[in-house]
């Protein structure tokens, strides 16, 4: 159960989110991912969002070139791996890796493992995403194989 208690000093709230408190949802930014809200946007009055994201479908199209309109963003890979283009550089992000993605940085997620999962923290909670022209070609993704 999520417990939220308002504090007078900061107008922020305490939040405790357990794995069964919030479901995995498919109505997030990308339809090939599943998202699990961790209650942080509500607890911070929209200052920050924290959610878990995991692979739902194979990386056939990727995210397209884009950047986020935000003040702060980090991604902590908790399982699997993903390959990004950060501007014109291929970057492999594996379980345990943490990325600070500066505001406005052009990127493209083009490949990931079936078990890929990450924690994403962004400020503000209602950050925007802007599609842009990319600086280079994208390498091919790795097809998933049936187990």
Task: State where each predicted segment sits.
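A short, N-terminal "cap"/entry segment at the start of jelly-roll beta-barrel domains
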Residues: 1-57, 131-147
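A short beta-loop-beta micro-motif enriched in histidine and acidic residues
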Residues: 30, 43-48, 58-74, 87-88, ...
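A short hydrophobic beta-strand segment most commonly corresponding to one strand
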Residues: 48-52, 100, 113-131
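Short, conserved beta-strand element in jelly-roll/cupin
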Residues: 52-56, 67-86, 121-124
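Short acidic-glycine-tyrosine-enriched beta hairpin
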Residues: 87-105
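Conserved catalytic-core motifs of eukaryotic protein kinase domains, centered on the activation segment
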Residues: 88, 111-112
């Amino acid at each position: 159960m999520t417990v939220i208690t308002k504090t007078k000093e900061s107008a922020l709230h305490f939040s405790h989110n357990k794995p069964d408190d919030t479901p995995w949802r498919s109505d997030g930014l990308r339809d090939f991912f599943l998202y699990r809200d961790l209650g942080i946007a509500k607890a911070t009055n929209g200052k920050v969002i924290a959610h878990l994201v995991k692979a739902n479908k194979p990386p056939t199209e990727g995210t397209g070139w884009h950047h986020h309109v935000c003040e702060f963003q980090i991604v902590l890979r908790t399982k699997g791996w993903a390959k990004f283009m950060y501007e014109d550089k291929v970057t492999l992000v594996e379980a345990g890796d943490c990325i600070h993605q500066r505001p406005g940085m052009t990127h493209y997620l083009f490949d990931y493992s079936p078990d890929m999962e990450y924690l994403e923290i962004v400020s503000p909670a209602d950050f925007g995403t802007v599609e842009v022209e990319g600086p280079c070609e994208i390498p091919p993704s790795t097809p998933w194989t049936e187990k």
